[in-house]
């Protein structure tokens, strides 16, 4: 791509989060979801205004819904659907139907990374004219293991070009 074509490059941001715990036997499902938007600042601003208006600053947990949380969820969905650049998709794993031993040698970090890569690739599409940034909820990853660099490397190697420029995990309670 020529330098004068830089305005054609899309710079979407992916917000990745999970629900459920892979290694918890009594938790039958594990899900990864991603919101992709080319205008993250607008969506974040709407959510911040909503949180300030309702004085609600805690993390939303689906298993702890209350009347106030229903209202913030409703208005949050409204803000999301008004953002024409925002897209949501997810992958839901029914853990008892998957053979983690055969496919992943029971390496649950590999399971998480593999499904993260799959979800991101499905949302990148052909990768043409896109350079993405991924922000993920802080998922336990032991020292010496690097989810961010591994995921970015796998995706960029797949496309044979830079499609993911950055991947950062943050604690969702701090943002």
Put a short name on every predicted segment.
Residues 1-175:
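Phosphate-ester processing/binding pockets and catalytic centers
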């Amino acid at each position: 791509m020529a330098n004068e074509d830089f305005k054609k490059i899309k710079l979407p941001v992916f917000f990745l989060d999970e629900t459920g715990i892979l290694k918890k036997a009594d938790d039958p499902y594990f899900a990864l979801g991603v919101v992709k938007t080319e205008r993250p600042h607008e969506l974040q601003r709407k959510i911040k205004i909503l949180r300030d208006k309702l004085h609600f600053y805690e993390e939303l947990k689906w298993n702890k819904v209350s009347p106030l949380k229903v209202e913030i969820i409703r208005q949050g969905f409204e803000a999301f659907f008004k953002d024409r650049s925002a897209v949501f998709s997810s992958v839901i794993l029914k853990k008892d139907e998957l053979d983690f031993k055969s496919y992943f040698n029971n390496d649950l970090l590999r399971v998480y990374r593999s499904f993260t890569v799959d979800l991101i690739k499905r949302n990148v599409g052909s990768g043409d004219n896109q350079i993405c940034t991924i922000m993920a909820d802080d998922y336990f990853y032991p020292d010496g293991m690097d989810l961010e660099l591994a995921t970015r490397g796998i995706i960029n190697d797949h496309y044979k070009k830079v499609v993911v420029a950055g991947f950062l995990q943050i604690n969702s309670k701090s943002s």
